[in-house]
């Protein structure tokens, strides 16, 4: 029963992630993030199985923590990619992704390294009760860091993401926003 509830919690969180990223970015970003998240969950669950860790609420919490941690890394990189698309003069996505990942790499490695150091200490000194949780987190953090760099971003290339099309949509959004603000200002002045 716990396994079924855990899988349901993971499925619900993946759906929520898909919706959130699709609203915040674009559907291709959302699919790339979900593929990355599935990668992390499969590797973490594989480690739980490989090391014969008891599946309990602690390991379920570890898997969900890995999902959140990896999603945070992925969103930071995607945000930098989106910013690069808007500001770069390049029209191809691959160089923009490369620059964006390079710009966030030191932050990603430092954050993951410090978190990993804390979880490793927790594994060795936290006692037997928390070792399963810690080991699942160790594997998940490593998988999440690698997937946000090497899985999520390159997946955008597979989905034929068009930089020019994205820029045109952003220009249209800006025009609609400007028109809306102008109409609102005219309404407030009473000139409509």
Provide a role label for each language-model segment.
Residues 125-192:
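Hydrophobic alpha-helical transmembrane segments of membrane transport and translocation systems
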Residues 3-43, 47, 112-124:
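Internal alpha-helical transmembrane segments of multipass membrane proteins
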Residues 24-27, 51-53, 125-127, 160-161:
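Short helix-capping/hinge motifs at transmembrane helix termini and TM-loop junctions
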Residues 13, 17-20, 65-72, 140-144, ...:
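Alpha-helical transmembrane segments of multi-pass membrane proteins
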Residues 29-81:
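Hydrophobic transmembrane alpha-helices and their membrane-interface caps
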Residues 1-2, 6, 90-125, 135, ...:
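Pore- and gate-forming transmembrane helices of large, multi-pass membrane proteins
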Residues 60-80, 102, 106, 111-118, ...:
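Transmembrane alpha-helix detector for multi-pass membrane proteins
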Residues 26, 42, 46, 70, ...:
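Transmembrane alpha-helix boundary/anchor motif
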